[in-house]
Amino acid sequence: MTLTPQSIASGQQNAQIGTDLVLETDTMRVWHLRLAPGETIPPHRHDRPYFWTVLTDGKGVSRFDDGQVVPITYKIGDTKNFADLTPSTGFVHDLSNTGDSDLIFVTVEFNTEGKTS
């Protein structure tokens, strides 16, 4: 099942990319994301450079605003960097934990203009 137009519109307004904001400065935000088995983080937007690192093995599925539905297998230490992301190249997605143990990530979101969204 893909994201609905309503969930995409809601996600475009949602800048909460984790479950806990643990640090915010003028130039970055550090988030923790913990999803229990079967849990989903709601659609949210990414519109600035960021990277994530997964702290646990697990499985998930992410639905994107372009209609993609992507199953993912994570291994501890996997990291993905979105260094060139901007408001014009941003995207909306959600993430569901389809595994049988918690999925835990740390995500660092950068703001090159000194403001966070």
What are these regions (language model features)?
Residues D47-D66:
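Glycine- and acidic-residue-biased ligand/ion/polar-headgroup-sensing regions
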Residues M1-I17, E113-S117:
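Basic/polar N-terminal segments that are highly enriched at the extreme N-terminus
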Residues A15-P42, R48-W52, F105-V108:
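A short glycine-rich, His/Asp/Glu-containing loop-to-beta-strand
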Residues H44-H46, V92-H93:
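Histidine-centered active-site/metal-ligand motif
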Residues A36, L55, K75-D78:
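Residue-level recognition of short, solvent-exposed, well-ordered loop/turn junctions
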Residues D94-G99:
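Asparagine-centered strand-capping/turn motif at beta-strand->loop junctions
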Residues D66-P87:
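Short acidic-glycine-tyrosine-enriched beta hairpin
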